[in-house]
A protein has these predicted regions:
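Histidine-centered phosphotransfer motif of kinases
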Residues: 199
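Catalytic palm subdomain of template-directed nucleic-acid polymerases
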Residues: 208-218
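A short alpha->loop->secondary-structure connector
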Residues: 5, 48-54, 70-75, 128, ...
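Glycine/alanine-rich phosphate-binding loops at beta-alpha junctions
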Residues: 1-55, 64
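Glycine-rich, often acidic, oxyanion-interacting loops/wings at catalytic, nucleic-acid
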Residues: 107-195
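Short, intrinsically disordered, charge-balanced linker/junction segments flanking boundaries
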Residues: 1, 217-221
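Short alpha-helix plus adjacent loop in nuclease-associated cores
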Residues: 55-108, 147-151
Length: 221
């Protein structure tokens, strides 16, 4: 309570390692604080499951609080974070549910594959133009393979250079279609998403993205 340092230790950012250290600490632990970061949420899940009251502190607020320190070292930063936690001078970051993160991962995976498909389509278009071959504008992702494959196969040199690229794009597109089906299936089995999709213009992707972003609407009360 008086802010005295009882122990300092370098520990790997692993749930089991942190829990083992806290269990062997020998003093009552009222709260555990983590600065917001890539691993913070995963560590929070594990620590909370182990029974520790854990909060994630907003990184910019922590950085601002530590900015007045003259000697910036990992040890001094850790001490500063501990003091921020002790005094309560921090902004807590809401930790989204695992379900929300799984949904966001599915959406991000789908988006990444679509982006790669578009990049490869544009690459093929650009390379074909050098030889006077212009694929029509507005060509959808589905018909693209057939439209590009025909002129490529008519030229042995082009086929040698571009068919591997076209095959990779096709595989990516097929993987994208599978993820797209999974996203829509997930949305169609979620009561909140079904309600959101009754709004004109709101489809499965928008509904699921909003659902995952909000996670628990009760946190806004």
């Amino acid at each position: 309570a008086d802010g005295a340092v009882l122990a300092e230790r370098m520990i790997a950012s692993e749930v089991d390692d942190l829990i083992a250290y806290l269990q062997d600490f020998g003093e009552e632990i009222s709260i555990v604080g983590l600065e917001a970061g890539t691993l913070a949420q995963w560590l929070t899940y594990g620590l909370r499951d182990a029974g520790y009251h854990t909060v994630v502190m907003e990184a910019r607020h922590v950085k601002s609080a530590l900015g007045a320190m003259r000697n910036k070292t990992d040890r001094n930063d850790a001490r500063g974070i501990a003091q921020i936690l002790r005094t309560g001078w921090y902004r807590e970051v809401y930790v989204k549910s695992l379900e929300s993160h799984y949904t966001r991962t599915l959406l991000a995976s789908r988006k990444a594959l679509l982006s790669k498909c578009i990049n490869l389509e544009n690459e093929v278009r650009g390379l074909l133009k050098v030889f006077g071959i212009k694929l029509r504008a507005g060509l959808g992702h589905g018909p693209f393979d057939e439209a590009a494959r025909e002129p490529i196969l008519q030229n042995e040199a082009l086929a040698y250079a571009l068919m591997p690229l076209l095959e990779v794009r096709l595989q990516l597109y097929q993987a994208y279609l599978e993820l797209d089906r999974r996203v829509k299936r997930l949305a169609n089995n979620d009561a909140v998403c079904l309600l959101l999709m009754t709004t004109p213009g709101v489809g499965a992707i928008t509904a699921l993205t909003f659902r995952a972003a909000v996670d628990d609407p009760r946190r806004f009360r």
